[in-house]
Design a protein with these regions (language model features):
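N-terminal phosphate-binding or glycine-rich loops at protein starts, especially the Walker A/P-loop
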Residues: 1-43
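Short, glycine-rich nucleotide/cofactor-binding loops
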Residues: 3-15, 145-155, 299-304
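Short glycine/serine/threonine-rich phosphate/pyrophosphate-binding segments
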Residues: 12-17, 81-94, 98-112, 119, ...
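Phosphate/nucleotide-donor binding subsite
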Residues: 50-96
């Protein structure tokens, strides 16, 4: 398995991507292509103790970088020698099995759509992070790729999320819920009501295990396995979950270290608290799958450290090996979406 990593994307590039590549090579045996400025990558490899480029690691030179402040709509086209563009071109040409970037989300979405292409028949690609719930995990789709959606897009997202939950996470007959302000079918705006009708019809035909509308608190309690949302609502939910996790971890630590008695309790609970913190840590997940693209693409968090990049490689391998893209391609007709003309 060969994975491409954008070595210039993210807050801690190129150090975090390069060191993450070395960890992934050691832990998963994956071959890695690092795209970016060769001199910068070699410098980081040297800092990591590598006197030469290790076996299983390749460098694809790219002199330009798509910055987070660049306009996503134009940056990808203007910077043709960027680490992002070079990596996506390699993926399109079949030089690797997947691509990871912690750079600009908008540029990655635009580049993946224009270069690697969506699966024929799909209207939009969507970001599908895995979030923790009280009973395990759930797929949240979309969480920022599409701020404005139609009911057709959300129907498509439900299928994509369901395939991901089943094929990658191993959930049998994943329960699909529509993120809304109430559980009743009449709740929500026009988009939510129209989407509810489409999802209910798909559920009646046995194509989806649709359980109805679901509120955010119920979803986090484990009420469903796939949370369907437009990118605007989904992103707010995701950021709220991340913020709440930081709040809980910080407050819990303060409570358990404010006196001698609580410090003793902290020592007794230390291992359990470490597991709790690990469950809430986005670096443990690795990244967010960009579903609907014809090859595996994963968006790593902008603040990803080396461990996060390593975990993103694990996740990308899981997507590549799952057969999810082939399954989606073969079942587009179920989604009631007429293929667009090339």
């Amino acid at each position: 398995m060969k994975i491409i990593i954008d070595a210039m994307g993210g807050d801690f590039a190129p150090e975090a991507p390069v060191r993450g590549a070395l960890l992934a090579r050691e832990k998963y045996g994956a071959d890695i292509i690092l795209t970016g400025r060769t001199a910068d990558i070699l410098r980081e490899l040297e800092k990591a103790g590598c006197k030469e480029v290790p076996q299983g690691i390749e460098i694809a030179n790219a002199e330009e970088v798509v910055e987070i402040c660049d306009d996503p709509a134009t940056a990808f086209k203007q910077k043709k020698d960027s680490s992002l563009t070079v990596g996506l071109n390699l993926l399109r040409d079949g030089q690797a099995d997947g691509f990871i970037s912690a750079g600009s989300t908008g540029a990655l979405l635009a580049g993946a759509t224009l270069v690697v292409k969506r699966i024929r028949g799909l209207r939009r690609a969507a970001l599908a992070p895995t979030i923790p719930t009280m009973t395990g995990k759930a797929v949240l789709i979309d969480c920022g790729a599409n701020a404005e959606c139609t009911s057709e897009y959300l129907l498509q997202f439900a299928y994509l999320g369901s395939y991901y939950a089943e094929k990658v996470l191993g959930i049998v007959q994943p329960r699909v819920g529509l993120l809304n302000i109430g559980a009743e079918p009449s709740k929500g705006d026009t988009l939510r009501r129209e989407t509810y009708a489409r999802l209910k019809e798909a559920g009646g035909q046995g194509h989806l295990n649709f359980i109805g509308n679901i509120e955010a608190n119920t979803a986090l309690a484990g009420g469903c396995d796939v949370i369907v949302a437009d990118g605007y609502s989904g992103n707010i939910m995701l950021k709220s979950v991340e913020g709440a996790a930081k709040l809980m971890s910080g407050e819990l630590k303060k409570m358990l270290t404010k006196s001698a008695k609580t410090k003793l309790a902290y020592l007794l609970l230390k291992d359990g608290l470490a597991d709790f913190k690990k469950m809430l840590d986005p670096n443990e997940v690795g990244g967010t799958a960009l579903l609907g693209i014809s090859r595996p693409v994963v968006k790593a968090h902008g603040s990803s450290n080396a461990a996060a990049f390593c975990n993103a490689v694990r996740q990308t391998i899981a997507v590549a090996e799952s057969g999810i893209i082939a399954d989606i391609t073969q079942n587009v007709d179920k989604m009631k979406i007429t293929p667009e003309k090339d």
